Design a protein with these regions (language model features):
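Flexible "stalk/tail and boundary" regions
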Residues: 1-21, 25, 35-92, 96, ...
Length: 154
């Protein structure tokens, strides 16, 4: 992980990498050790796109909350996005083993069951938690798109 931006800009944490774990019998997932320092003060877990879960630092959550709050409430899509983001969100804290608890509603959304393989990825300012089955499909689609971009670039 590193801090992005120039010395004069506000620094933002950037999470990088891909890690495999298993959801334990109590619905907990190990957060990679290189990400834990940033989550010591707690974090927020919420629904992400493509059936992943997002883990945000408290600061990044506040930034995202402000963006969501500024969306026009007169637009149906904005209201739906806000509802999905906020109603599915939970405050969380790492336990002494570096794990976070994932409640049943978020496990169902992300298609992650007890004892399932899980992929935890750094995705810039957020950490994403994926069912490894879903992650492999997403990565396969991304690899194909990347190959097409390379063909276009020549």
């Amino acid at each position: 992980m590193f801090k992005s931006g120039s010395r004069h800009e506000r620094r933002r944490k950037v999470f990088l990498g891909e890690f495999r774990h298993i959801m334990d019998s109590k619905g907990r997932i190990v957060i990679p050790s290189k990400f834990r320092k940033e989550l010591q003060q707690g974090c927020v877990v919420t629904k992400g796109l493509d059936n992943c879960l997002q883990v945000l630092t408290k600061k990044n959550w506040l930034d995202e909350s402000e963006k969501m709050a500024s969306l026009p409430s007169t637009e149906k899509t904005s209201r739906q996005l806000r509802r999905a983001l906020f109603s599915g969100a939970i405050d969380s804290k790492l336990d002494s083993a570096g794990r976070i608890q994932i409640p049943e509603n978020l496990r169902k959304y992300s298609e992650i069951g007890i004892n399932d393989d899980v992929t935890v990825t750094g995705s810039g300012p957020v950490i994403e938690i994926w069912s490894t089955k879903v992650w492999k499909k997403i990565q396969n689609d991304a690899d194909k798109a990347f190959a097409n971009i390379n063909e276009v670039k020549g």
